[in-house]
From Swiss-Prot:
Pfam families: CARME (PF07942). GO terms for biological process: carnosine metabolic process; methylation. Carnosine binds at D351, H382, Y433. It catalyses: carnosine + S-adenosyl-L-methionine = anserine + S-adenosyl-L-homocysteine + H(+). Transmembrane segments: none annotated. It comes from Gallus gallus (Chicken). This is Carnosine N-methyltransferase. Optimum temperature is 40 degrees Celsius.
Length: 449
């Protein structure tokens, strides 16, 4: 990014915190505390030491000095202990980061085992039926064999993603044991991984185009309307997309010539976006079977095993000189520089907050005076009903009131923008969201410190 789009040090490629409800203590705060501890240790090192005795009562002078030294040093000891504790905290944080990185890598590698166990269970249950009932469905077991082949193919793609990502974020050492024993992954991690496979449909397949048109296109249209080429040098319009997922919205914005940065903190998303953005260039050269996990609501057996192809465009086809990047980390920790961004575009994002007011506060701070915030999405709060997790579930009315009290001016507001999210178009069950679209502007004269 240009100097105008500088972000804090934590925005550089570094291991982001675990996704959603499983976050570690903020690394930024611990690093700041560690710096304070080091400064205090340096203060101790600058304490005066006794000069060579030149006469009088050397032993008395030395004892007097030692007594005074004890008095001077004693108040420093709690600080030294605190500094040592902070060092231990940072070491623990790094250990947790390595463990989280390896846990997600393991989930990618465990996918095939997990899915084969699922299919094997279905086969056992089918074979427990009376023989006359089994004979009514001669294609059932061959269909399961087809699913097994799809699983193996998906695992090959996931292994390719893993092979590339073990060296991401300067964490090469984290991947050195990547060929080690695969251990069972949690149900939570496997659900996240299966959901990530559907993100390829949403962001990088032809099948996902209607969904992108419903929620990405309104954002892009507002960007073009507010930053027209007649009045703006696109390359100097700095746009941030928090919660960028696999990066398609940010990529589309950069494709128009704007300087765009996507931000994401889920390793499932970051590993996958790294693969599609940096390793895929030929259109529709890759294939996935994202619907094989869905054993219910299939009209036809073939619907379950149909493939999707990606990417539907060449991610490397950005115009020469384009300014497009992705950062890894927590949105609130990374972006702290006041008055930096011309536009912030959030899509299905604000309900990922523990406290959506924190998101609003960060957006207000980092937007330039006169900058705009464009939002599309529902309010399906991700931490609702999770034990031991802060979750403030506000209505849109409440959110709107908070936005106005911060000082934003509402320029566009639509309360029923119909959209889906990673929908299976052939499924017998679909979820539709009536999303809110709004465009709000930070006044020129306002600057929040």
């Amino acid at each position: 990014m240009s100097a105008a789009c500088a972000v804090s040090r934590e925005a550089q490629p570094a291991l982001p915190p675990p996704p959603r409800g499983d976050r570690d203590p903020p690394a930024k705060a611990m690093r700041r505390g560690l710096r304070r501890g080091r400064e205090e240790e340096q203060d101790q090192e600058r304490l005066p030491w006794p000069a060579e005795s030149g006469g009088g009562d050397p032993e008395g002078e030395q004892e007097a000095w030692r007594s005074g030294e004890r008095r001077r040093r004693q108040p420093q000891e709690p600080r030294a202990l605190a500094a040592a504790a902070r060092v231990e905290e940072e070491a623990e944080e790094e250990r947790m980061e390595r463990e989280h990185f390896r846990r997600i890598i393991n989930a990618f590698r465990y996918y095939g085992t997990n899915m084969h166990e699922r299919v094997n269970r279905t086969e056992r249950q089918f074979k427990s039926l009376p023989a006359n009932q089994q004979s009514l469905l001669p294609q059932f077991l061959p269909h399961l064999d087809k699913i097994r082949k799809c699983i193996d193919h998906n695992q090959e793609i996931l292994q390719t993603i893993v092979n590339d990502c073990v060296h991401m974020f300067e964490n090469k050492e984290y991947g050195e044991d990547g060929g080690g024993k695969i251990t069972p992954a949690s149900t939570f991690d496997m659900d996240k991984l299966k959901s990530t496979l559907k993100q390829f449909v949403r962001d990088w397949s032809e099948e996902g185009k209607p969904e992108r048109d419903s929620c990405y296109q309104p954002i892009i249209s507002e960007i073009v309307k507010n930053f027209p080429k007649e009045r703006w040098d696109f390359s100097k319009v700095n746009i941030l997309v928090p919660g960028a997922g696999l990066g398609r919205l940010a990529w589309e914005i950069a494709m128009l010539g704007y300087a765009c940065q996507g931000n994401e903190w889920s390793l499932f998303m970051l590993f996958s976006s790294n693969f599609v953005l940096n390793r895929c260039s030929e259109v529709n050269s890759c294939k996935l079977y994202p619907w094989i996990h869905q054993f219910s609501n299939n009209k036809r057996s073939a619907d379950q095993i149909r493939p999707i192809y990606f990417p539907d465009v060449d991610p490397h086809s950005l115009p020469s000189g384009s300014n497009f990047s992705m950062t890894a980390g927590d949105f609130q920790e990374i972006y702290s520089e006041c008055n930096t961004w011309d536009c912030i575009a959030t899509c299905f994002f604000i309900d990922t907050a523990h406290n959506v007011i924190d998101y609003i506060d960060t957006i207000w701070k980092i937007l330039k005076p006169g900058g705009i915030w464009i939002n599309v999405g529902p309010l399906l709060y991700h931490f609702e009903n999770l034990a031991n997790e802060l979750s403030i579930e506000l209505s849109y009315e409440d959110i709107k009131n908070v936005i106005l009290q911060y000082g934003f001016h509402i320029e566009v507001e639509k309360e029923s923008v119909l959209s889906t999210y990673t929908v299976n178009e052939l499924s017998m069950m679909k979820y539709y969201y009536e999303c809110v679209l709004f465009v709000v502007r930070k006044p020129e004269e306002k600057c929040f410190e």
